[in-house]
Amino acid sequence: MQTYTIKPAQSVRGEIAVPGDKSISHRSIMLGSIARGTTTVCGFLRGEDNMATLNAFRAMGVDVRDDGETLRIEGKGLAGLSEPTDVLDCGNSGTSMRLMTGLLAGQRFFSVLTGDQYLRNRPMKRVLEPLSRMGATIFGRAGGDKAPLAVVGRGLTGVTYASPVSSAQVKSAILLAGLYADGETEVTEPHLSRDHSERMLRYFGADIETFAGGVKVRGRELTGRDITVPGDISSAAFFIVAALIVPGSELLIKGVGVNPTRTGIIDILTAMGGSIELLNCREISGEPVADLLVRASELKGIEIGGDLVPRAIDEFPVICVAASCAEGRTVIRDARELRVKETDRIAAMAVNLRKAGVDVVETENGMELIGVERLEGCTAESFGDHRIAMSMLIAGLAARGEITVNDTECIATSFPNFIALLEKVVVP
């Protein structure tokens, strides 16, 4: 088991670029594989999750060439994938499993999806239910709620589905299945979740229409495109919080994706009093991008809920760290989805922050915590979750003493060079 010990920092300073966006990287492989013609991808995130997606499509006959800088995908068209000869292993990636389940439901072959011990215990019925309404045949453990999942490809029919949860994975699985369905497929959700699938489908030429509260798609061949993947705001979030909570810090993070469905982290931290400027705003491959200038700030506790939650769902572990260093009480609500991530992120952060001296009260769908003047040194657990591990390492920068995080191998899931980048900007 790998461990890493972080010491308190004097400041966080410099200029960095974070790795490519994980969500966009997944989708570039999927859509590039089922489009006609060649797709090139610059800035692809070579983390374990994205490599699981890449390897799955290679196993279905897609030629993906990687020269270390650019991926070149020779698309097969909607009906061109081949039946895999082995189980498709999604590793720790819920995005890979849920989105591929939707895509595979419309194929004319049999496939099986599995993952690691954590992924095999995450809920899948939220995807299987709407796909079954479209005519998909999918089997899984626990009545279809747990992987491995066996997908028997067949003809699909478009549906109108009101998702009870705001989940980009659920929405995207249905939209991908909708590419293969007869008629129109429509999805609505309580609050708008990240819209990378809609943007990229439109960029690839899909017959897609967005409207207030939802999206519609009809089957049509896609055309390969050139994609430049922006920096992942979920990865940038760790460095944003680091620069905010360590006095004397100033950090420029270049080329970050600032899709409005993902900038909840900026809105939350700004509402807490954080100094975050968006510079050099532009659009690349259908996605808004900016450079972020972050300066150390005195943060104050706030209430977080409603439509902010799906716009910052992956950033809540490090938001909890920011709240722990803020003056006063922070209340997080409407975030029950955090309990079914790679681990129960509400419980995991509560355990770790209590070790660091924070007064934390868990609720069913969130938590309440009171910030402290300085976190205490401690030994924290990652619980096998990359975002928990990185969040607690950021906490260590603002602690009185060292924070050691156990089981840090999981960081490679989404951010293989996190430690190296952190060491580059921390002034000890």
Curated annotation (Swiss-Prot):
Q: Where in the cell is it found?
A: Cytoplasm
According to its UniProt record, the EC number is 2.5.1.19
Q: Which organism is it from?
A: Geotalea uraniireducens (strain Rf4) (Geobacter uraniireducens)
**Positions annotated to bind phosphoenolpyruvate:** 22, 94, 122, 169, 345, 387
| CDD domains in the record | EPSP_synthase
The name under which this protein is listed is 3-phosphoshikimate 1-carboxyvinyltransferase
In this protein, the active site sits at: 314 (proton acceptor)
Could you state a single Gene Ontology molecular function term? 3-phosphoshikimate 1-carboxyvinyltransferase activity
- Name the family the entry cites: Belongs to the EPSP synthase family.
Q: Name one GO cellular component term.
A: cytoplasm
Q: Which UniProt keywords apply?
A: Amino-acid biosynthesis, Aromatic amino acid biosynthesis, Cytoplasm, Transferase
State its role. Catalyzes the transfer of the enolpyruvyl moiety of phosphoenolpyruvate (PEP) to the 5-hydroxyl of shikimate-3-phosphate (S3P) to produce enolpyruvyl shikimate-3-phosphate and inorganic phosphate.
